[in-house]
Amino acid sequence: MDSNTVSSFQVDCFLWHVRKQVVDQELGDAPFLDRLRRDQKSLRGRGSTLGLNIEAATRVGKQIVERILKEESDEALKMTIASAPASRYLTDMTIEELSRDWFMLMPKQKVEGPLCIRIDQAIMDKNIMLKANFSVIFDRLETLILLRAFTEEGAIVGEISPLPSLPGHTIEDVKNAIGVLIGGLEWNDNTVRVSKTLQRFAWGSSNENGRPPLTPKQKRKMARTVRSKVRRDKMAD
């Protein structure tokens, strides 16, 4: 087994332990906790593959990090921090759109993972645009702050927001929630578009028709919805 592979795992285990202490002291935000959860799963898998005990690896990782820090100069640390990537905050919505209260005539609420989806089922035959405010790192969506669905008249008819009780979410959580919101709005013959900014950083591309590519799971779900609606329409006739 390559020694660098082992030492990398040991250091990762110790750094995860340090980050866990930050969360335990309630000093970490939602993206921090999200990465912590994902890295925990990754470390368990790597430990199993390498045949290494995580607790023992953490202790050795601590020794490696302490040795490096003892040799690290303040100037080198400043240069490392300066070159580290920083997340950006992107805004589709204005402050007014972000903070505006809205009401639903026929409310429907669904929890999809760590995200809450709200839809006004009374809205029919409208052109709707999905806008979002979110942070980006490495040109990918990092954390969703808030997503809202707007009619051409500016009315809010849907929303996706993180659940305070379940902090942390992945980009896949966001895309799945958007698929559910689109399906719910299209049920009532609304035409839904997604902002180019959100398409670019969530899916890595933007389509002129404003529709992001759906996952196979979302396609199957929407197909079942369409078949169910067709059967209901036939029964009504």
UniProtKB/Swiss-Prot annotation:
UniProt key word RNA-binding: yes
Region ranges (RNA-binding and homodimerization): 1-73
Keywords in alphabetical order: Eukaryotic host gene expression shutoff by virus, Host cytoplasm, Host gene expression shutoff by virus, Host mRNA suppression by virus, Host nucleus, Host-virus interaction, Inhibition of host innate immune response by virus, Inhibition of host interferon signaling pathway by virus, Inhibition of host PKR by virus, Inhibition of host pre-mRNA processing by virus, Inhibition of host RIG-I by virus, Inhibition of host RLR pathway by virus, Interferon antiviral system evasion, RNA-binding, Ubl conjugation, Viral immunoevasion
Main subcellular location of this protein, as a coarse class: host cell
Nuclear localization signal, short sequence motif: residues: 34-38
GO process terms (BP): symbiont-mediated suppression of host cytoplasmic pattern recognition receptor signaling pathway via inhibition of RIG-I activity; symbiont-mediated suppression of host gene expression; symbiont-mediated suppression of host mRNA processing; symbiont-mediated suppression of host PKR/eIFalpha signaling; symbiont-mediated suppression of host type I interferon-mediated signaling pathway
Domain remark in the UniProt entry: The dsRNA-binding region is required for suppression of RNA silencing.
Record family assignment: Belongs to the influenza A viruses NS1 family.
Known role: Inhibits post-transcriptional processing of cellular pre-mRNA, by binding and inhibiting two cellular proteins that are required for the 3'-end processing of cellular pre-mRNAs: the 30 kDa cleavage and polyadenylation specificity factor/CPSF4 and the poly(A)-binding protein 2/PABPN1. In turn, unprocessed 3' end pre-mRNAs accumulate in the host nucleus and are no longer exported to the cytoplasm. Cellular protein synthesis is thereby shut off very early after virus infection.
Record's protein name: Non-structural protein 1
Gene source species: Influenza A virus (strain A/Hong Kong/1/1968 H3N2)
Lineage start: Viruses, Riboviria, Orthornavirae, Negarnaviricota, Polyploviricotina
